[in-house]
Amino acid sequence: SGGFDFSFLPQPPQEKAGVGLGPGPMGLMGPRGPPGASGAPGPQGFQGPAGEPGEPGQTGPAGARGPAGPPGKAGPGKPGRPGERGVVGPQGARGFPGTPGLPGFKGIRGHNGLDGLKGQPGAPGVKGEPGAPGENGTPGQTGARGLPGERGRVGAPGPAGRGSDGSVGPVGPAGPIGSAGPPGFPGAPGPKGELGPVGNTGPAGPAGPRGEQGLPGVSGPVGPPGNPGANGLTGKGAAGLPGVAGAPGLPGPRGIPGPVGASGATGARGLVGEPGPAGSKGESGGKGEPGSAGPQGPPGSSGEEGKRGNGEAGSTGPTGPPGLRGGPGSRGLPGADGRAGVIGPAGARGASGPAGVRGPSGDTGRPGEPGLMGARGLPGSPGNVGPAGKEGPVGLPGIDGRPGPIGPAGARGEAGNIGFPGPKGPAGDPGKGGEKGHAGLAGNRGAPGPDGNNGAQGPPGLQGVQGGKGEQGPAGPPGFQGLPGPAGTTGEAGKPGERGIPGEFGLPGPAGPRGERGPPGESGAVGPSGAIGSRGPSGPPGPDGNKGEPGVVGAPGTAGPAGSGGPGERGAAGIPGGKGEKGETGLRGEVGTTGRDGARGAPGAVGAPGPAGATGDRGEAGAAGPAGPAGPRGSPGERGEVGPAGPNGFAGPAGAAGQPGAKGERGTKGPKGENGIVGPTGPVGSAGPAGPNGPAGPAGSRGDGGPPGVTGFPGAAGRTGPPGPSGITGPPGPPGAAGKEGLRGPRGDQGPVGRTGETGAGGPPGFTGEKGPSGEPGTAGPPGTAGPQGLLGAPGILGLPGSRGERGLPGVAGAVGEPGPLGIGPPGARGDGLPGHKGERGYAGNAGPVGAAGAPGPHGVGPAGKHGNRGEPGPVGSVGPVGALGPRGPSGPQGIRGDKGEPGEKGPRGLPGLKGHNGLQGLPGLAGQHGDQGSPGPVGPAGPRGPAGPSGPPGKDGRTGHPGAVGPAGIRGSQGSQGPSGPPGPPGPPGPPGASGGGYDFGYEGDFYRA
């Protein structure tokens, strides 16, 4: 698998041919020589290249949540006045973990208290029990197979046999090739390859089961709110050059996690531009005769910015006509961060005046070309904190800084998503050959050779005198196997010998024949239940089902008669079911097309307020009553001075689109009237009486059963049961494996001396004697002549591939070029590329002046229809010829935000895109002003605490019920958690179209700007 050429490695040596003797007389077939000695183990093979990294294992299930702290008692508190913000207190000492207390009675829900001071982070809590171990990751791919070791050397030939006549027989067959040596020890690991590029972020893994809900902790005392501090701009230091990656060091021992480091210092706040002077209040002139429209004048020059005066804020004059929009200025470098100024006292909020007269819309100026980048200015002196200036352009990205020192190990974070496997890194250099391994264990004993021919039994010799015990001589060659003698008489039973050293276990013998089936044994006692296994990995998400056909819209039912009975008693609160497990995150579908803006509905009339009735029992939420009749329009009040502009509130949710009215007949075109003076906005009519509560709706169908609960902790082991009866003796097992060869026994007594044998025949001529010693060296001869030039040698051994070079420093980003002229040409063919990332939302344009309220339209009658089915897309029309470029028309008014389109069908998963360039980092946006705190709603009384019912199965999350009637205000409780967002309000009256924004979009280098 590595793809290397191993032809350069040393090859096993070849056997040299021996010098042959003269052909001797043909002898008888001698006995087979003993097998040759096993060859020495071959050298250690090279280690193959490292295998590909295995895919990361799946994220293990989340650990069990630690025990909850004791619940706190909710004390009755009264709403306090907003005070000044206090000083942050010192960090408290770490407390001992408290024992979980009993759950207290549910207290009465109080009003939302004021935000307390942000305390310093408490001491780290006691570490919870470790979670269950995660699933083992899939094993990595097997590394490349090492080079085969050298073949064992051929054993030395056995001694030559001799025939009966003494002649040398032919050389016996070569002994069996020795078994291969044991595998060598693994070689040293090769150098670590360079890290491959970071893989794309994988899809989010399945969320672990939600932990049990802890008991509520003790509420801290409500601190007085302080004055809001000035929001400083986030400082950004210049990034240094990237450092050269050092060699990977050996992993050191894991250190003890150090304390959490202190938060870094907040960057200094940048200099803020000076505000412009407030316009002088214009006087309302008399109504003049309408003159003819004159030619358009040149745009006026923008005035210089004045410095802010020390006087109180004057009244705002009427809104003047918007001037021509100037082109964007040259792009300057970001200035140095200035020091934060002193926080001034908050000024009193002035009264809001009536809306000023709407001025005529100014002409839209053409967008200017972006100017060249100016020189970097010197840092200015720290000035007073003024109003926030406009956001400057994004600076060029700095070059990467050198890697800093390794900080202390932080707390262990939650398991991240499973990433895609990164690309395969380059193969590492082959490791050095390992040292010669130890001698391996002896191989299996070879099969016994064929039995030799039995020799003729000689006559028994005379028994000689027993000689003395001689020294142990060398072991002779194995003799011929004699015929088995007759069985002797049975001797006396010897004494039991000492127990020998148990031999090692031999190889298992062949399995014996299967015995007869024994009688069935009695059933054993039931063992204790095993521990519950860990939860397996989540399966792959199933395919999406087909979308069902939309049902027919039913006719609105008639309201049933009102029930005679009052509202029933409030039942005891059931035990909340556990939250179901979060499903796996689906693939992101393609972005649907933006729907067209729907028509804005007519506003409903505002009714007069009715008298406040007595607070009744809380009933079921009824259907909404009809709106009351519109009150009489008040007389226009005197025109007051325009008040200062209030803070920008948060954008409310878009109202539901009303039903379009019937199209009226087209009237005759009347003469063009004169522009009248816009009258002041009349007062808002009083609210109408609240409608009666409708009858209670039918009970909803019972919800589906909830998912199975989380597997509980394994129970304690049960008591050990009584011993069961003895089982029936089973059939005899198969014979055991043959034991290891025993130790060599002691040498026996020397046998009697045999008779002298007959003189044998003469032997064959002996072998050539050994080579004699070398003679003395002779004198040096004359130098020879130079030989001819030799042939070119064979090419050398192919070298190993060199290591990968270090990564070079990234080049500096080039300057942004000027945008070219707007090209005109036919539209190109539609590309087949992948959809790009959705760009960031541009900055909103300046809001136009508020127009006068339109006349209220007729109140629509009838239930709101459901959204119609989405029509099939029509056929694509043929592309017509490109028309001439017309003049740029004026920008139309901003349309009403349309309803959110239905989500499109789930598209196929696209291929992972290429890694894009790092975009320019945007400046942080200005912090919005805090809106006015709404008045807290009244809270109903708490019902009597009923007995705890049995725990039911956890159900699915039910649908949101209708809001009930508001009960009387209860005693103020402790501050609760932030509630969910309320439903969107009814659509407001349609305003007149705003002034032309005159914005334009332009982008470069992947960044999007809105002017």
UniProtKB/Swiss-Prot annotation:
Q: Which residues carry this modification: 5-hydroxylysine?
A: 106
Keywords, sorted A to Z: Extinct organism protein, Extracellular matrix, Glycoprotein, Hydroxylation, Secreted
Gly residues bias locations = 282-291, 323-332, 464-473, 560-578, 700-709, 757-766, 820-834
> Where does it localize?
Secreted; Secreted, Extracellular space; Secreted, Extracellular space, Extracellular matrix
| Highest taxon above the source species | Eukaryota
List compositional bias (Basic and acidic residues) regions by residue number: 663-672, 897-908
Q: Which Pfam families would you find in this protein's record?
A: Collagen
* InterPro entries tied to this protein: Collagen, Collagen_superfamily
- Tissue expression per record: Expressed in bones.
Instruction: List the residue ranges of the region (Disordered).
Output: 1-1011
- Report the main location listed first in the record: secreted
4-hydroxyproline modifications at: 10, 13, 35, 41, 367, 370
Q: Where is the composition biased (Low complexity)?
A: 28-67, 167-182, 292-302, 345-361, 396-415, 520-537, 549-559, 588-635, 642-662, 680-690, 711-720, 774-801, 809-819, 843-856, 872-887
What residue spans carry the Pro residues bias annotation? 981-993
Q: Which cysteines are joined by disulfide bonds?
A: none
Q: Which residues are glycosylated?
A: 106
Misc: These protein fragments were extracted from an ancient bone collected in Haiti.
**Subunit structure and binding partners:** Trimers of one alpha 2(I) and two alpha 1(I) chains. Interacts (via C-terminus) with TMEM131 (via PapD-L domain); the interaction is direct and is involved in assembly and TRAPPIII ER-to-Golgi transport complex-dependent secretion of collagen.
Task performed by this protein: Type I collagen is a member of group I collagen (fibrillar forming collagen).
| Protein name (record) | Collagen alpha-2(I) chain
The taxonomic lineage of its organism, from the top, reads: Eukaryota, Metazoa, Chordata, Craniata, Vertebrata
